[in-house]
Amino acid sequence: MTTNEPHIADVAASISQPAMIEAEHIAPLTHIEAGIMARVELERFLGRVKTLSAADWDQPTDCTLWNVRQVLAHQAGAYAGFASWSQFMRQWSQLFKKRQPGQFSVDLVNQLQVADRANASPAELIAELSEVGPKAIATRQRLPAALRALRFPFGPPLGFVRFDYLTDLIYTRDTWSHRLDICRATGREMVLTSDHDGRMLALVMRDLAGKLHLELKDSAIAFKLTGTAGGNWRVGPGENPVASIQMDALDFSRLSSGRLNPDEARDQSLVVINGDAQMANYILANTSVPY
């Protein structure tokens, strides 16, 4: 006698083990979706900085060169760069200037944004971001498809990429990661929802899968990220993962953005590895994508 009903053990397993998604099959970000995510993230970022007290602004952040006020200054400057043509040209002309050893071209852009606002108060920075933020998003949404598809050399860590990889994805990812920086620095809660923040982390995982595909050859690694923004992903062409890496989703973001290194993650017990430890640690050492 046969039945189409699932075995009770299979049902229990499906409840205790959430479905694992192949990271390379995560849907790419569309231009329309990019606009929606950018507006949500700007609203959440502004909502958080508007709650900060006077004592919060000088707190150091995971971006070791910047305190909380300087992170806000960077964000105000980044959005200002797409709110007016003159600001865009002034900021991005920095890409062609000589860099210091170990410095990325984009660091020069970021430095200018912060330096321009060195004397601005937090209230002035919030007011500026409230004004230029929506304008910048609207500008990016109006960019013609032909322009968005052009590939440009942005230098490390972006390299040679489509313009819309920057305008649709990286700018919003940057704001998201700096919201996390500010929440950690000030002890504030990071507002998270699976549809927005979970999608943000899924797109990080998609980038990571593209980067590691050749590294893994015929193998695969399972990433199990806990929390509201988390999920279970298989990275690599292999069908059965040889190891699993479990982390809180926000700690994974810090790792993949360079704010947390693998040794710190292990020393602070922020990562749990099962299976092939050598392979898992190799992948940890290469878990980085542009932010």
Identify the function of each model-found stretch.
Residues 143-150, 189-192, 215:
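Short, structured loop/turn "capping" segments at alpha-beta junctions
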Residues 118-172:
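Internal, conserved structured core segments that host functional sites
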